[in-house]
Amino acid sequence: MTTAFYPGSFDPMTNGHLDVLVQALNVASKVIVAIGIHPGKKPLFSFEERAELINRSLADALPKKAADISVVSFDNLVVDAARKHGASLLVRGLRDGTDLDYEMQMAGMNRQMAPDIQTLFLPAGTASRPITATLVRQIASMGGNVSAFVPPAVLEALTGKLKDPAK
């Protein structure tokens, strides 16, 4: 049984994240979606909200795979968090050459620290290649339609959050 660790901020989860997760489930028997907690950053959604949105999105998109996916948080090195959860694969999605350059450096450093954990690069599909959570937040905050870029649960939460920032 192979366990994959898919780290990210997922603020919010996008269709690009979902695309990579579906691919990861074709390679690993279990995938841990790991939300990184960075004390210096102010996310739009709290950890609890992001975890709920991920779980709702997965229940809608992949109902038969729900038991194979778990959502956790981490605030330490990715390789240490992956090891703690018994993962032997780190999943990284790639949109373009810029992502590849950055991820190759990270994979090299991770391999030095944890040679027992392999990095698996998964290319984004054509439809999800331009999507970033940052752009989704920017477009949504300016009143743009992001329905093509995020799962329905995320769209609903984004709409509510941006209409009432206290949520």
Swiss-Prot record:
Please write the reaction equations for the catalytic activity of this protein.
Answer: (R)-4'-phosphopantetheine + ATP + H(+) = 3'-dephospho-CoA + diphosphate
Q: Which GO terms describe its cellular component?
A: cytoplasm
Q: Which InterPro entries match?
A: Cyt_trans-like, PPAT, Rossmann-like_a/b/a_fold
**Any one GO biological process:** coenzyme A biosynthetic process
Binding sites annotated in the UniProt record for ATP: S9, F10, H17, G93, L94, R95, E103, S128, R129, P130, I131, T132, A133, T134
Q: Which Pfam families match?
A: CTP_transf_like
CDD domains, alphabetized: PPAT
Q: What is its main location?
A: cytoplasm
Task: Enumerate the UniProt keywords alphabetically.
Answer: ATP-binding, Coenzyme A biosynthesis, Cytoplasm, Magnesium, Nucleotide-binding, Nucleotidyltransferase, Transferase
What cofactors are annotated for this protein? Mg(2+)
Annotated site, Transition state stabilizer, chain positions: H17
Entry's EC annotation: 2.7.7.3
Q: Which GO terms describe its molecular function?
A: ATP binding; pantetheine-phosphate adenylyltransferase activity
Q: In which pathway does it act?
A: Cofactor biosynthesis; coenzyme A biosynthesis; CoA from (R)-pantothenate: step 4/5
Which amino acids does the record list as binding substrate?
A: S9, K41, V78, R92
The subcellular location is: Cytoplasm
**Residues of the signal peptide:** none
| Function per UniProt | Reversibly transfers an adenylyl group from ATP to 4'-phosphopantetheine, yielding dephospho-CoA (dPCoA) and pyrophosphate.
Give the UniProt family note: Belongs to the bacterial CoaD family.
On subunit structure and binding partners, the annotation says: Homohexamer.
The protein depicted here goes by the name: Phosphopantetheine adenylyltransferase
